[in-house]
Amino acid sequence: MKSLAPGIKLITSFSRDSWYRFSILFLTFVFYTSYHLSRKPISIVKSQLHRNCSNVVHPANLNITDNDTWCDWVPFDGKNYQNLFGVLDNCFLVAYAVGMFFSGIFGERLPLRYYLSTGMLLSGLFTALFGLGFYWQIHSLWYYCLVQALNGLVQTTGWPAVVACVGNWFGKGKRGFIMGVWNSHTSVGNILGSLIAGVYVSSAWGLSFIVPGIIIASTGVICFLFLVERPEDVNCTAPQHHERVEEEPLLRNSSTNEEIFNSHTSTAVEPVEDHSEAISFCGALRIPGVVEFSLCLLFAKLVSYTFLYWLPLYIANVAHFDPKKAGDLSTLFDVGGILGGIVAGLVSDYTGGRASTCCAMLIIAAPMLFLYNKIGQNGLPTTVGMLLWCGALVNGPYALITTAVSADLGTHECLRGNSRALSTVTAIIDGTGSIGAAVGPLLAGLISPTGWNNVFYMLIAADVLACLLLSRLVYKEIRGWCGYTTRQRGFKEI
């Protein structure tokens, strides 16, 4: 008898449910990568909108009135250009923070496929409109602010929808690890966005926005054609979100940790009535842990986004690297964030303590930030090592809260009979965090003239506050560990 080809053996070794789960994980990864890809060009194009024109060769037929600003793009040619760039950033971030609270409410009441695909199409439109200002010769600050604000609003469709979709397909077993790996889409999108924008920024900066706009709009079409919202829609087995065991501490993971792609994940679940009515905003706030994790993320995201917007400038000013090298080194913070998110997911899966894992990483992050400010620029190896450590410790809790914790709370045991809470809970948590994302860079801009030390003291204080806000949940988890002596930890052999 002829043996099957190795590739066919591999394909047939996975069940139909497993293939669907893998496809959902891959599609949502691509979708949110495109969201971040379309956000990145503005940080790359800023250096082109305002340059040192005295070093630029001007065309012979051009009448130059100001040798220092002739090549700048009005209205960013004045001495207040940094303030105007700050206005552009905050137009996006504030609109994103406000819109996120409403996004989840709409996401629970509209089909995720339509909601997500429409959001990506509109994001592509507004991203491209910013770039079209180059070809239409638009020099009005209000135009660019309006486009940024509208883009910030429609970008809120992404995160609650993709987390809700992944939460619908994956149970609690190994959710932290899977989502920790999956959450790398943030860094992948940032890197791709930088590379694509960099190709066109010097020749025609409008294309730095138009091309990413076309990419995210194209992924919106793919979403409309291929996204499956729930396992039940294609007759797949629904995942296990709850356990039939004695009461456990808040956010405890399944001690059995079922295989994440196993098609038989719901056999131990009691059938429960599933009402189709979506949860209200106030109802989502009453879910145990939502308020604490939301406020924790506010301060955690404040630290993360301050690094995102100010780290290259800090490295250039303090370590005296040129702008390109400073930008390249700053990407190590994102690399550390990927590793931190994966480690946080693994540890929280193994211990069952989401809050304890976040708190431990935040506690260690505070002294590491202090050390980075003091010794982080003493040579290239030290800089690389400290950036990786700080990125892991700062972004690890941020990644865990926005992914696994949001999915856990959106399928919390108190919601039996009302499963439509994932999108609203995710929006509340990420929306609160986005307030910190808007405030952090703004505070850094106000504090940095007084010295970089004060900026780091602000970041350390935010880290400590984030940790303190989880103290009640950590106490409950520790009590649970001490009270349930027969409880097993670790991953069950499959």
Swiss-Prot record:
> Which residues does the annotation flag as glycosylated?
52, 63, 67
Q: Which residues cross the membrane?
A: 20-37, 85-105, 116-136, 146-166, 187-207, 208-228, 295-315, 327-347, 355-375, 384-404, 427-447, 455-475
Determine the domain of life of the protein's source.
Eukaryota
Task: Cite the Pfam families for this sequence.
Answer: MFS_1
The reactions it catalyses are:
D-glucose 6-phosphate(in) + phosphate(out) = D-glucose 6-phosphate(out) + phosphate(in)
Which InterPro entries does this entry report, sorted A to Z?
MFS, MFS_dom, MFS_trans_sf, SLC37A1_2, Sugar_P_transporter
GO biological process per UniProt:
glucose-6-phosphate transport; phagosome maturation; phosphate ion transmembrane transport
Q: What is its main location?
A: endoplasmic reticulum
How does this protein sit in the membrane? Answer: Multi-pass membrane protein
Q: Where does it localize?
A: Endoplasmic reticulum membrane
CDD domains from the entry?
MFS_SLC37A1_2
Asked whether the UniProt record includes Transmembrane among its keywords, one would answer yes
The Gene Ontology terms for molecular function here are: glucose 6-phosphate:phosphate antiporter activity
Tell me which GO cellular component terms the UniProt record holds. endoplasmic reticulum membrane
The protein's UniProt keywords, in alphabetical order, are:
Antiport, Endoplasmic reticulum, Glycoprotein, Membrane, Sugar transport, Transmembrane, Transmembrane helix, Transport
Family according to the record: Belongs to the major facilitator superfamily. Organophosphate:Pi antiporter (OPA) (TC 2.A.1.4) family.
Report the function annotation for this chain.
Answer: Inorganic phosphate and glucose-6-phosphate antiporter. May transport cytoplasmic glucose-6-phosphate into the lumen of the endoplasmic reticulum and translocate inorganic phosphate into the opposite direction.
Which named protein is this? Glucose-6-phosphate exchanger SLC37A2
What organism does the record attribute this protein to?
Danio rerio (Zebrafish)
Q: Which lineage ranks, top first, belong to the organism behind this chain?
A: Eukaryota, Metazoa, Chordata, Craniata, Vertebrata
